[in-house]
């Protein structure tokens, strides 16, 4: 009979493993795991973005050879991507800058 007794307190369920995996992915990706628990949906979007980047890199190599002297344009593309990713923060920062500017003007007038 002792063989039939199973200690369930030390067993790890599949659900627990999935939750732990989501937490690890969240930490690695720097963002929250999908609320619906379907990580494939979010990863699918990420994979699509990666495919576009690869296509741009392949096409971009030819352009780089033609425009070796115009390195500024390459840097501009990276800046635009960074701004697009943080567009909401940039808008919030602009509002803060306006407030700071107004404060500086009133301080100068005094």
Swiss-Prot record:
<feature type="compositionally biased region" description="Basic and acidic residues">
    <location>
        <begin position="100"/>
        <end position="110"/>
    </location>
</feature>
<protein>
    <recommendedName>
        <fullName>Prothymosin alpha</fullName>
    </recommendedName>
</protein>
<keyword id="KW-0832">Ubl conjugation</keyword>
<feature type="modified residue" description="Phosphothreonine">
    <location>
        <position position="101"/>
    </location>
</feature>
<dbReference type="GO" id="GO:0043066">
    <property type="term" value="P:negative regulation of apoptotic process"/>
</dbReference>
<dbReference type="GO" id="GO:0042393">
    <property type="term" value="F:histone binding"/>
</dbReference>
<feature type="modified residue" description="Phosphoserine">
    <location>
        <position position="2"/>
    </location>
</feature>
<dbReference type="GO" id="GO:0045944">
    <property type="term" value="P:positive regulation of transcription by RNA polymerase II"/>
</dbReference>
<feature type="modified residue" description="N6-acetyllysine; alternate">
    <location>
        <position position="102"/>
    </location>
</feature>
<comment type="similarity">
    <text>Belongs to the pro/parathymosin family.</text>
</comment>
<dbReference type="GO" id="GO:0005634">
    <property type="term" value="C:nucleus"/>
</dbReference>
<feature type="modified residue" description="Phosphothreonine">
    <location>
        <position position="106"/>
    </location>
</feature>
<keyword id="KW-0597">Phosphoprotein</keyword>
<feature type="modified residue" description="Phosphothreonine; by CK2">
    <location>
        <position position="14"/>
    </location>
</feature>
<feature type="compositionally biased region" description="Low complexity">
    <location>
        <begin position="32"/>
        <end position="41"/>
    </location>
</feature>
<keyword id="KW-0007">Acetylation</keyword>
<feature type="modified residue" description="Phosphoserine">
    <location>
        <position position="9"/>
    </location>
</feature>
<feature type="compositionally biased region" description="Basic and acidic residues">
    <location>
        <begin position="13"/>
        <end position="31"/>
    </location>
</feature>
<feature type="modified residue" description="N6-acetyllysine; alternate">
    <location>
        <position position="15"/>
    </location>
</feature>
<feature type="modified residue" description="Phosphothreonine; by CK2">
    <location>
        <position position="8"/>
    </location>
</feature>
<dbReference type="GO" id="GO:0140297">
    <property type="term" value="F:DNA-binding transcription factor binding"/>
</dbReference>
<feature type="modified residue" description="N-acetylmethionine">
    <location>
        <position position="1"/>
    </location>
</feature>
<feature type="compositionally biased region" description="Acidic residues">
    <location>
        <begin position="42"/>
        <end position="83"/>
    </location>
</feature>
<feature type="region of interest" description="Disordered">
    <location>
        <begin position="1"/>
        <end position="110"/>
    </location>
</feature>
<comment type="function">
    <text>Prothymosin alpha may mediate immune function by conferring resistance to certain opportunistic infections.</text>
</comment>
<feature type="modified residue" description="N-acetylserine; in Prothymosin alpha, N-terminally processed">
    <location>
        <position position="2"/>
    </location>
</feature>
<feature type="cross-link" description="Glycyl lysine isopeptide (Lys-Gly) (interchain with G-Cter in SUMO2); alternate">
    <location>
        <position position="102"/>
    </location>
</feature>
<keyword id="KW-0539">Nucleus</keyword>
<keyword id="KW-1017">Isopeptide bond</keyword>
<comment type="subunit">
    <text>Interacts with NUPR1; regulates apoptotic process.</text>
</comment>
<feature type="modified residue" description="N6-succinyllysine; alternate">
    <location>
        <position position="15"/>
    </location>
</feature>
<dbReference type="InterPro" id="IPR004931">
    <property type="entry name" value="Pro/parathymosin"/>
</dbReference>
<dbReference type="Pfam" id="PF03247">
    <property type="entry name" value="Prothymosin"/>
</dbReference>
<feature type="modified residue" description="Phosphothreonine; by CK2">
    <location>
        <position position="13"/>
    </location>
</feature>
<feature type="modified residue" description="Phosphoserine">
    <location>
        <position position="10"/>
    </location>
</feature>
């Amino acid at each position: 009979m002792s063989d039939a007794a199973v200690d369930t307190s030390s067993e790890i369920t599949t659900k627990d493993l999935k939750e732990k995996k989501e937490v690890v992915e969240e930490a690695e990706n720097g963002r929250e795991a999908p609320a619906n628990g379907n990580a494939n949906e979010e990863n699918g979007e990420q994979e699509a973005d990666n495919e576009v980047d690869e296509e741009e890199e392949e096409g971009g190599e030819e352009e780089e050879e033609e425009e070796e002297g115009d390195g500024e344009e390459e840097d501009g593309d990276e800046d635009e991507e960074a701004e697009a990713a943080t567009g909401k923060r940039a808008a919030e920062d602009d509002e803060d800058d306006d407030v700071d500017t107004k404060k500086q003007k009133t301080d100068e007038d005094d």
